[in-house]
Amino acid sequence: MQQLTEIVEQALVIIDQASDLKALDDIRVDYLGKKGKITDMMKMMGSLSPEEKPAFGQAVNDAKQAIQQKLTERIDGLKSSELEAKLIAEKIDVTLPGRTQEIGGLHPVTRTIERIETFFGELGFSVKQGPEIEDDFHNFDALNISEHHPARADHDTFYFNPKLMLRTQTSGVQIRTMETEKPPLRIISPGRVYRNDYDQTHTPMFHQVEGLLVDEHVNFAELKGILHDFLRNFFEEDLQVRFRPSYFPFTEPSAEVDVMGKNGKWLEVLGCGMVHPNVLRSVGIDPEKYSGFAFGMGVERLTMLRYGVNDLRSFFENDLRFLKQFK
């Protein structure tokens, strides 16, 4: 019995000194395992008399329970300490700002369209929309584009049939507006247009903004002043701007507008001119009473110049590495 008492006392001391769960498991095996010290004590019962066996068996069983209880308490204590230490290590400072969710940004082409709409909106221009599938009257005939003009060729225009096509410019919106509204008119018509072309500076689909002003006594000086102010506002620079004589079937006189680039070279940015009298007649407006001017610009080209993008196709490839630069 004395030996059993010493084994229990020794086990309890060692259990208290154990610093981790592995050490406790080693103690369990050393005392309660198949070859453990308590198990060895049970083997001594074979040498005892029948009278001694019950008391000895009870003592061994009590010793085993005492050690097991101590092990359980110590295991629970170590697990609690480990959990507390882990919680302290993972403590969250609730006063810190939370993780913000990444949000999307406007596409650079959309930014440009909104910038254009804002500028002309402040000048009293309203935004008009029209169909992207257009008929030949609104896309060509009403714009004074002759039947044999190169723009009507199959290699330039996407035709559904001889009378229906994907619009090649948003000028059709101007025609539709003049058909349904009377002067004075101030409108811009942003939207997608389609031409059969694809390279570094052209895509089959691109965006265009065209503008129209029709009223009495409208002159080219007004057109120059508005476009000059627009370009300086858009590029946020005191740009050098020039107007070059050009030709468009729907305007007379016509001009192309250039700005001086940072490399010292002129860069074409838009076309413009006074609305051709034939265009006004085609929609029932008297050219003897009213005059007007029109202008058109490629949105992607303006965006490329504003942000220094070299390849127009980058706007349509949906590469987040590219698009995130404009957030």
From Swiss-Prot:
Keyword annotations from UniProtKB, A to Z: Aminoacyl-tRNA synthetase, ATP-binding, Cytoplasm, Ligase, Magnesium, Metal-binding, Nucleotide-binding, Protein biosynthesis
First-tier enzyme category under EC: ligase
GO biological process, one term: phenylalanyl-tRNA aminoacylation
Cofactor(s) the protein requires to work: Mg(2+)
The keyword Cell division is annotated on this UniProt entry: no
Subcellular location: Cytoplasm
Keyword Magnesium assigned: yes
Reactions the enzyme catalyzes: tRNA(Phe) + L-phenylalanine + ATP = L-phenylalanyl-tRNA(Phe) + AMP + diphosphate + H(+)
A Pfam family assignment: Phe_tRNA-synt_N
InterPro entries per UniProt: aa-tRNA-synth_II, aa-tRNA-synth_II/BPL/LPL, Phe-tRNA-synth_IIc_asu, Phe-tRNA_ligase_II_N, Phe_tRNA_ligase_alpha1_bac, Phenylalanyl-tRNA_Synthase, tRNA-bd_arm
PANTHER family, sorted: PHENYLALANINE--TRNA LIGASE, MITOCHONDRIAL, PHENYLALANYL-TRNA SYNTHETASE
Subunit structure: Tetramer of two alpha and two beta subunits.
The protein, known as: Phenylalanine--tRNA ligase alpha subunit
